Amino acid sequence: MSTFDPDALECLAAIVEEGGFERAAQRLSITQSAVSQRLRALESQVGTVLIVRSRPLKPTSAGQLLLKHTKMLRLLRADLERDLKELAPSSLGGAREEERISIAINADSIATWALPALSELARQGLPMEIIHDDQNFTHEWLREGHVLGCVTTLKQALRGCKVEPLGAMQYIAVATPDFAQNRLALPCGTGDRPTAPALTQHNFRDVPFVAFNRKDELPSEFVGKAFGLKRVTLNQLFVPSSQDMVRAVLAGWGVSVVPRLMADALIEQGLLVNAAPAYTLPIQLYWHCWNLESEVLDALSAALRQTAAAVLVAGPVSGPTQLIPENPQVRQVLTR
């Protein structure tokens, strides 16, 4: 097989990653016509179409293979630059913008512990691109060759990849004190003892839940396991940001199921209350990456592993995820 032109491969990657020819041209600092010419030359060399001209643009199966090959070349270059900098620190410039090392991480991890984990690598100049998605879907980015690693809930290693457990992220249901008092307080009948406002199997259907997006299954999973229900239908509002979900709850939008790492300080300040204090939902997270010998991959894996060990609940969850009693001694996210 003939050697592929690295510039043509990066052109293919830019088209897919930027979602179009015009933005790819801007990223590569070439004309849109040059982008088309490079793609046509690469397709002629391979002998098949590499891009489906749809909205959004999608790579064909052959295109996905070449994308994965391109990312492997980026990884090799990053390894080489890392080694050369140790021998001659002033001999290399920064990595080219189009040669970013891409990983997929779930939004809640980005909002809590993942960025501190990667800060030192960023300061060292590793050109990273972090793609966020729901924790149940980040592995699809790895499966399709768009990233070289991902944080996900998938336990089984993907083909050609290795996997290691990171620990469990603990989730609780939260609301503002006013919302809880107005919407979650139980009416007391004759002889009933008053109870603190809480989410129950009787009132959850009438309460709005703030979720990340339509793929977010955490609220339904939490309610279903908390109350032993197989099917759960919730009244949901969608806010596609972990931090902004908390802001929406603070604004009185409703209840949300969020990481304790985000909620504990707000509960201590009296801004939020635990809407279901008897329950915590642990979600086990795993780090998947290509099964390659690479200093960059090793550095990424070590950085995520070390920080996760400090802030997540240690040890893999065996079998189906179970609701566990709330632990008041939650460890805080490391600050660096």
Model regions and ranges:
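A late-sequence structural motif
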Residues: 113, 275-330
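Alpha-helical linker/hinge and terminal dimerization helices associated
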Residues: 45-46, 66-94
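Central regulatory/effector-binding core of bacterial HTH transcription factors
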Residues: 95-159
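Hydrophobic hinge/microswitch elements
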Residues: 229-274
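Secondary-structure junction motif
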Residues: 195-229
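A short LG(V/I)-centered, amphipathic sequence patch enriched
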Residues: 43-62
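Short helix-boundary/capping micro-motifs
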Residues: 13-31
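Hydrophobic two-helix hairpin corresponding to the core of helix-turn-helix DNA-binding domains
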Residues: 12, 24, 60-63, 252
